[in-house]
């Protein structure tokens, strides 16, 4: 059941890419960042304050808004960073339930729960010449979605690019977005080597990796997170 659903998520991207072209005009609304590659140390998405501890959930209020409000931003960011729009929707849904003012005790802010010294710092180093984002900028929905989507792209195309199976790579991207790549490697695969991680993952089918991340991974929040994001991505496929 899982493999069939997840393969549908991946194959849908080819058809949705044509639809995204019509949203190119919305792209100008994003903060100006030009995708490129450079070498930086792995930075945890949640920052360096408590990387090995379970992460508190954000403050979700009754004021959480409907996802359609952010559709133009999500589609533009999806096209810009070549990340499935359904995945962006799913991450936002699980992270903040589309509440742009959500904030966590772990100092994560906004729709995609961005931290200053995590995803924002990584994206700033790679694409803004090290110019950091202010808290006000991080809370801005357009910038927040741009940062979060850029970070998903970095995980997918830089750190985890040697994972050949696209389905398996996406599962790792989702897990790393939640707990940080170093924690994922350390607690899930007993390594801090990307090459060793690649080898270990190559020994697993996508189904086996899904079980490992959702049933066996020692951080409960991440287990639940991966399962929930995969579930929500399937729901958002036709957005």
Language-model features and meaning:
Residues 1-11, 121, 128-150, 154-239:
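Non-catalytic cell-wall polysaccharide-engagement segments
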Residues 2-75:
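N-terminal export signals and maturation junctions of secreted/periplasmic proteins
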Residues 47-100, 142-145, 157-163:
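Export/targeting segments at the very N-terminus of extracytoplasmic proteins
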Residues 82-101, 114-115, 148-149, 173-179, ...:
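Short, functionally critical alpha-helical segments immediately adjacent to catalytic or ligand/cofactor-binding
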Residues 100-102, 122-124:
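Activation segment
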Residues 105:
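A conserved mid-domain beta-alpha-beta active-site/ligand-binding segment of alpha/beta enzyme cores
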Residues 109-113:
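Metal-dependent catalytic core segments for phosphate chemistry
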Residues 116-120:
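Short glycine-enriched loops at secondary-structure junctions
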């Amino acid at each position: 059941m899982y493999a069939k659903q997840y393969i549908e998520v991946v194959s849908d991207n080819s058809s949705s890419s044509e639809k995204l072209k019509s949203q190119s005009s919305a792209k100008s609304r994003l903060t100006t960042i030009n995708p490129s590659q450079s070498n930086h140390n792995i930075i945890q998405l949640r920052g360096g304050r408590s990387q090995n501890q379970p992460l508190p959930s954000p403050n979700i209020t009754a004021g959480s808004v409907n996802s359609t409000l952010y559709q133009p931003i999500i589609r533009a960011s999806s096209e810009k960073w070549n990340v499935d729009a359904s995945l962006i929707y799913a991450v936002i849904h699980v992270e903040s339930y589309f509440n742009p003012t959500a904030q966590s005790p772990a100092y994560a802010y906004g729709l995609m729960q961005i931290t200053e010294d995590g995803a924002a710092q990584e994206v700033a180093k790679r694409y803004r010449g090290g110019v950091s984002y202010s808290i006000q900028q991080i809370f801005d929905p357009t910038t927040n979605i741009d940062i979060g989507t850029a970070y998903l792209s970095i995980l997918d195309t830089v750190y985890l690019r040697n994972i050949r199976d696209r389905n398996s790579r996406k599962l790792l991207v989702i897990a790393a977005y939640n707990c940080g790549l170093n924690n994922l490697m350390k607690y899930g695969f007993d390594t801090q080597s990307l090459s060793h991680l690649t080898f270990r993952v190559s020994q697993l089918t996508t189904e086996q990796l899904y079980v490992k991340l959702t049933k066996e991974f020692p951080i409960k929040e991440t287990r639940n997170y991966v399962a929930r994001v995969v579930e929500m991505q399937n729901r958002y496929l036709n957005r």
